């Protein structure tokens, strides 16, 4: 493919995104010829399209002893374009039974989402050869149509962000030819030839042998991946329609919906909903645990199926996803209206609570004292108010609580409570604005 042909293909990919002026286009730089080609094509595109924002990101997870030198080389090449760049070292936590490569990939994508705007388009250099290898890896894992679809040319990402792979139909040979013609600088990572790594084994041992025997084999793989993607899209559309008709509101998925269908349909419905909630899909075994346990679950059974980064629970005839949070913030006295709770979000309180020598404390501890709500008859324990509000048991201890002069006055999700502050003067919470709790998602729940 001629270099102008590659550029035309790149432009067609971006035009299909229906970009808006000011939207951010981000080149993800890994250092190889493919990502350097993406950057060069993007910079050519910038010359004719200055109405967008442009950014190049390289994250060094230090897996290779020469990675720091490589980063310096890549950064110098990127800055020669005069584009805004972000070059950072990246700490990669590796969990049990997780490969180093998978951990690095997850950490990179997570950090790039943090560094980009909500509607950004992240441009990736993955190509035809990568797509064929991905198909084989999914086949090895026993994947269905969704997995065998491999990588999409354009796909949703975090928030309103999207991933775009303009070179997905282009061979590695054509990319190298372009990079050489443009005299680009790139890194040859020697670990790419380590056939102990699954993808490298496929790249150097398996795919060349198959294409030597059947020259059109690669094209057939790409066609199968495309057909799987189309089949999956049709199935998802039908399942989403079925879910929509059954839901009373967006976060609710009644278990009665599962009882109306076969086991295969139950699994498909669960997969589609989890995907729509932006959770990673569970394994087949985990999905079966969810499906089977849900059929006999009760509020007292404390059902909990652990998945990757979340767990599935049962409450009030529905399944819920819990984000598997860490330690709660420590109780603290408040001297300012705005409080940063780290991974739990932010809390803004009315200034009136911080005047008149009031002692205002933030806590997550549930009191056994009975509380009254303005305009409501009777007094109840806080746990009973939370239960009445339909808040699942595992979330009841995760609600920020404001304690004024030793008395609970506000609970996130429940609102104001009333009490006597000084002698017989009633605390008039109805005249105070509601505190603003913006959750970062660490405490949040979603219903299946």
From Swiss-Prot:
Keyword annotations from UniProtKB, A to Z = ATP-binding, Cytoplasm, Ligase, Nucleotide-binding, tRNA processing
Please state where this protein is localized: Cytoplasm
Among InterPro entries, the record links this protein to: Lysidine-tRNA-synth_C, Rossmann-like_a/b/a_fold, TilS/TtcA_N, tRNA_Ile_lys_synt, tRNA_Ile_lys_synt_N, tRNA_Ile_lys_synt_subst-bd
Check the UniProt entry and state the signal peptide residues, or none.
none
Primary enzyme class: ligase
Cellular component GO terms held in the UniProt record: cytoplasm
One Pfam family assigned to this protein is ATP_bind_3
Listed under GO biological process in this entry are: tRNA modification
Q: Where does ATP bind?
A: 30-35
Q: What molecular function terms (GO) are annotated for this protein?
A: ATP binding; tRNA(Ile)-lysidine synthase activity
Q: What is its main location?
A: cytoplasm
Report the EC code(s) recorded for this entry: 6.3.4.19
Write down the chemical reaction(s) this protein catalyses: cytidine(34) in tRNA(Ile2) + L-lysine + ATP = lysidine(34) in tRNA(Ile2) + AMP + diphosphate + H(+)
- What does the entry's free-text domain comment contain? The N-terminal region contains the highly conserved SGGXDS motif, predicted to be a P-loop motif involved in ATP binding.
**Protein's job:** Ligates lysine onto the cytidine present at position 34 of the AUA codon-specific tRNA(Ile) that contains the anticodon CAU, in an ATP-dependent manner. Cytidine is converted to lysidine, thus changing the amino acid specificity of the tRNA from methionine to isoleucine.
In terms of PANTHER family, this protein maps to: TRNA(ILE)-LYSIDINE SYNTHASE-RELATED (PTHR43033:SF1)
Q: Which NCBIfam families match?
A: lysidine_TilS_C (TIGR02433), lysidine_TilS_N (TIGR02432)
Similarity comment: family membership: Belongs to the tRNA(Ile)-lysidine synthase family.
> What is the name attached to this protein's record?
tRNA(Ile)-lysidine synthase
Q: Which organism is it from?
A: Idiomarina loihiensis (strain ATCC BAA-735 / DSM 15497 / L2-TR)
From the broadest rank down, the organism's phylogenetic lineage runs: Bacteria, Pseudomonadati, Pseudomonadota, Gammaproteobacteria, Alteromonadales
């Amino acid at each position: 493919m001629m270099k102008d042909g590659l550029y035309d293909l790149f432009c067609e990919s971006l035009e299909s995104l229906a970009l808006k002026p000011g939207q951010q286009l981000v080149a993800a730089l890994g250092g190889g010829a493919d990502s350097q080609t993406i950057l060069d094509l993007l910079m050519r595109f910038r010359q004719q399209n200055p109405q967008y924002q442009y950014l190049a990101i390289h994250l060094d997870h230090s897996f290779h002893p020469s990675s720091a030198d490589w980063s310096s080389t890549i950064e110098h090449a990127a800055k020669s374009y005069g584009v805004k760049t972000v070059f950072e070292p990246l700490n990669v936590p590796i969990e049990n039974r997780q490969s180093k490569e998978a951990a690095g990939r997850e950490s990179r994508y997570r950090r790039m989402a943090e560094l980009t705007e909500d509607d950004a388009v992240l441009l990736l250099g993955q190509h035809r050869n990568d797509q064929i290898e991905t198909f084989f890896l999914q086949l090895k894992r026993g994947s269905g149509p969704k997995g065998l679809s491999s990588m999409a040319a354009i796909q949703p990402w975090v928030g309103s962000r999207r991933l775009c792979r303009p070179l997905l139909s282009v061979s590695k040979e054509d990319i190298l030819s372009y990079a050489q013609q443009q005299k680009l600088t790139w890194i040859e990572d020697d670990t790419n030839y380590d056939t102990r790594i699954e993808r490298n084994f496929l790249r150097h041992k398996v795919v060349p042998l198959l294409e030597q025997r059947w020259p059109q084999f690669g094209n057939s793989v790409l066609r199968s991946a495309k057909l799987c993607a189309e089949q999956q899209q049709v199935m998802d559309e039908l399942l989403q329609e079925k879910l929509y008709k059954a839901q009373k509101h967006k976060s609710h998925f009644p278990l009665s919906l599962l009882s109306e269908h076969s086991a295969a349909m139950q699994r498909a419905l669960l997969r589609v909903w989890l995907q729509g909630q932006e959770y990673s899909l569970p394994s087949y075994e985990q999905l079966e645990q969810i499906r089977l346990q849900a059929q006999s679950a009760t509020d007292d059974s404390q059902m909990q199926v652990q998945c990757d980064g979340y767990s599935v629970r049962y409450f009030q005839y529905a399944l819920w996803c819990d984000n598997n949070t860490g330690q709660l913030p420590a109780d603290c006295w408040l001297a300012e209206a705005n409080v940063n709770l780290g991974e739990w979000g932010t809390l803004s309180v009315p200034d009136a609570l911080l005047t008149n020598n009031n002692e205002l404390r933030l806590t997550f501890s549930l009191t056994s004292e009975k509380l009254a709500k303005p305009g409501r008859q009777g007094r109840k324990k806080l746990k009973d108010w939370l239960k009445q509000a339909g808040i699942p048991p595992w979330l009841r201890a995760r609600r920020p609580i404001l304690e004024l002069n030793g008395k609970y006055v506000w609970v996130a999700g429940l609102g104001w409570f009333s009490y006597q502050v000084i002698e017989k003067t009633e605390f008039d919470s109805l005249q105070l604005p509601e505190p603003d709790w913006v959750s970062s998602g660490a405490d949040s729940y979603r219903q299946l």
